């Protein structure tokens, strides 16, 4: 990236940030967790700034301060949602720690000793609110995180809010980039201090903040070797194995070299998270409930003419495909690692 985004940050994003946050200090440094690695700022720009368009075109992150993408949803809070979101089921994760490490339940059979660190249940929205309020009243370590794709069970007012999103702007972005279809809008409601550990997605993402503030730390695809993802067949595929709170440098020595790109997003901000970029997301400490909606798009189709050398994200895709093919050919995901070690040791390292 990194030069381009860093240059933009140095040349003007600070002014945009001051302007966007002029009403008052919405958060302070005491609400951010401390980590061992350095970070650089992600640019904060107007959607009309040509530099913002350049960053998105180059698949580099940027915070857009004035898209009005989810303007009708800025009034959303727990009370409004409880009254209007309908009687569908919502996926709610509970954990005894602040970290919500994603896992794919369909892959749990590949690793018999795997134990998820959070539990998922399907409940009504009012049940989620009741559980949340009970936890807040009694205190303790238990935490909740609602993660649900918006679907046709929502009530009329939510539908009207959804139709009022700035689809004109985001559809133009989709068209200009040649992206595939919008695959989902994921609603995220988290407790203060919740953390989604570093992971990457295989889709383009406009991350729209609605309520509260979230800290977002991103890492480009070329830092793959610093972040040590789980194997493709593991339930935590695409997630980093490194515990950011207490890194094990003996197991993960390259983590010493990692450098993040950081921002804090508040209501109305939209963060572009490029496909294959790692992202670590945390609701600020003592910041109250956070509400976010993701806009996930399939990436652009592979060009007919491949340009060399390949980009970092293309190499990540190749590595994923190799792991998948070996798992299928061997008939046992547990044999993939030993075979790769046999291929590489003493020959390529």
Swiss-Prot record:
Write down a Pfam family by its short name: Cupin_8
For this protein, what reaction is catalysed?
A: L-asparaginyl-[hypoxia-inducible factor alpha subunit] + 2-oxoglutarate + O2 = (3S)-3-hydroxy-L-asparaginyl-[hypoxia-inducible factor alpha subunit] + succinate + CO2; L-histidyl-[ankyrin-repeat domain protein] + 2-oxoglutarate + O2 = (3S)-3-hydroxy-L-histidyl-[ankyrin-repeat domain protein] + succinate + CO2; L-asparaginyl-[ankyrin-repeat domain protein] + 2-oxoglutarate + O2 = (3S)-3-hydroxy-L-asparaginyl-[ankyrin-repeat domain protein] + succinate + CO2; L-aspartyl-[ankyrin-repeat domain protein] + 2-oxoglutarate + O2 = (3S)-3-hydroxy-L-aspartyl-[ankyrin-repeat domain protein] + succinate + CO2
User: Which cofactors, by name?
Assistant: Fe(2+)
For the modification N-acetylalanine, which residues carry it? 2
GO-annotated biological processes: negative regulation of Notch signaling pathway; positive regulation of myoblast differentiation
SUPFAM superfamilies (alphabetical): Clavaminate synthase-like (SSF51197)
Q: Which residues form a coiled coil?
A: none
Q: Does the keyword Glycoprotein apply?
A: no
- Residues holding Fe cation: 199, 201, 279
Which keywords fit this entry according to its UniProt record? Acetylation, Cytoplasm, Dioxygenase, Iron, Metal-binding, Nucleus, Oxidoreductase, Transcription, Transcription regulation
Q: What Enzyme Commission number(s) apply to this enzyme?
A: 1.14.11.30, 1.14.11.n4
One GO CC term, this protein: cytoplasm
Subcellular localization, per the record? Nucleus; Cytoplasm; Cytoplasm, Perinuclear region
Matches recorded under Gene3D superfamilies: Clavaminate synthase-like, Jelly Rolls
Record: residues binding 2-oxoglutarate: 145, 196, 205, 214, 294
The UniProt regions of compositional bias labelled Low complexity, in chain numbering, are 1-14
**Mind telling me which residues the site (Important for dimer formation) is annotated on?**
340
Task: Name the residues that bind substrate.
Answer: 152, 181-183, 201-203, 238-239, 300, 321
What residue spans carry the region label Disordered? Answer: 1-51
Its top-level enzyme class, in one word, is: oxidoreductase
Region ranges (Interaction with VHL)? 2-125
Recorded GO terms, molecular function?
A: [protein]-asparagine 3-dioxygenase activity; ankyrin repeat binding; carboxylic acid binding; ferrous iron binding; NF-kappaB binding; Notch binding; peptidyl-aspartic acid 3-dioxygenase activity; peptidyl-histidine dioxygenase activity
Q: What does this protein do?
A: Hydroxylates HIF-1 alpha at 'Asn-799' in the C-terminal transactivation domain (CAD). Functions as an oxygen sensor and, under normoxic conditions, the hydroxylation prevents interaction of HIF-1 with transcriptional coactivators including Cbp/p300-interacting transactivator. Involved in transcriptional repression through interaction with HIF1A, VHL and histone deacetylases. Hydroxylates specific Asn residues within ankyrin repeat domains (ARD) of NFKB1, NFKBIA, NOTCH1, ASB4, PPP1R12A and several other ARD-containing proteins.
PANTHER family in the record: HYPOXIA-INDUCIBLE FACTOR 1 ALPHA INHIBITOR-RELATED, HYPOXIA-INDUCIBLE FACTOR 1-ALPHA INHIBITOR
Its subunit composition reads: Homodimer; homodimerization is essential for catalytic activity. Interacts with VHL and HIF1A. Part of a complex with VHL, HIF1A and HDAC1 or HDAC2 or HDAC3. Interacts with NFKB1 and NFKBIA. Interacts with NOTCH1, NOTCH2 and NOTCH3 but not with NOTCH4. Interacts with ABPA3. Interacts with TNKS2. Interacts with PPP1R12A. Interacts with UBE3A. Interacts with ASB4. Interacts with ANKS3. Interacts with NECAB3; the interaction is indirect and seems to be mediated by APBA3.
User: By what name is this protein known?
Assistant: Hypoxia-inducible factor 1-alpha inhibitor
Species the sequence originates in:
Mus musculus (Mouse)
Q: What is the lineage of its organism?
A: Eukaryota, Metazoa, Chordata, Craniata, Vertebrata
Q: Which gene encodes it?
A: Hif1an
């Amino acid at each position: 990236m990194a030069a381009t985004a860093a240059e933009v940050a140095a040349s003007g994003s600070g002014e945009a940030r001051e302007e966007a946050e002029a009403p008052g200090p919405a958060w302070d440094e005491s609400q951010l967790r401390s980590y061992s690695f350095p970070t650089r700022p992600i640019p904060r720009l107007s959607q009309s700034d040509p530099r913002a368009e350049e960053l998105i075109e180059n698949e580099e992150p940027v915070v857009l301060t004035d898209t009005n993408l989810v303007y009708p949803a800025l009034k959303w809070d727990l009370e409004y949602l409880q009254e209007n979101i309908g009687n569908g089921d919502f996926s709610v994760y509970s954990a005894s720690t602040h970290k919500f490490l994603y896992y794919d339940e369909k892959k749990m059979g590949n690793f018999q000793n795997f134990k998820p660190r959070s539990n998922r249940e399907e409940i009504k929205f009012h049940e989620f609110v009741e559980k949340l309020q009970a936890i807040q009243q009694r205190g303790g370590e238990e935490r909740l995180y609602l993660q649900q794709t918006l679907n046709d069970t929502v009530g009329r007012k939510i539908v009207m809010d959804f139709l009022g999103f700035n689809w004109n702007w985001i559809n133009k972005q989709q068209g200009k980039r040649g992206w595939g279809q919008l695959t989902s809008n994921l609603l995220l409601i988290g407790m203060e201090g919740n953390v989604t550990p570093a992971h990457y997605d295989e889709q383009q993402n406009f991350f729209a903040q609605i309520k509260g503030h979230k800290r977002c730390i991103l890492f480009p695809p070329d830092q793959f070797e610093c972040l040590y993802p789980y194997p493709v067949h593991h339930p935590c595929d695409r997630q980093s194995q490194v515990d950011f709170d207490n890194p094990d440098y003996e197991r993960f020595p390259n983590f010493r070299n990692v450098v993040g790109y950081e921002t804090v997003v508040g209501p109305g901000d939209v963060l572009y998270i490029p496909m294959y970029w790692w992202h670590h997301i945390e609701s600020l400490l003592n910041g109250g409930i956070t509400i976010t909606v993701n806009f996930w798009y399939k990436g652009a189709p592979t060009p007919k003419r491949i340009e060399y050398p390949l980009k970092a994200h293309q190499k990540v895709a190749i590595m994923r495909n190799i792991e998948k093919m070996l798992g299928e050919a061997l008939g046992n995901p547990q044999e993939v690692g030993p075979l790769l070690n046999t291929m590489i040791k003493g020959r390529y390292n």
